[in-house]
């Protein structure tokens, strides 16, 4: 799995998990998200950038993505939408699925 990710996804080409860690697809996806965000000039690297896995539920495992833009609020909304569109397009490469729950 990891070799495939390294070959197909340039941002993961040099990824080496910690010793004694068997990486999962969700772990590698979180690494990808962090690397992707740090590669974007619109993301403010001087402020917090956090990608965390939240408590799993009967619907799945939520991932929280927290970052700041270098732009004003109105532009942030567009930037955020573009970034999430990119993540939605990349998720199948990690053999993951998006699930939306609504009442």
Roles of regions detected by a PLM:
Residues 1-103:
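Structured, soluble regulatory/oligomerization domains located on the cytosolic or IMS-facing side
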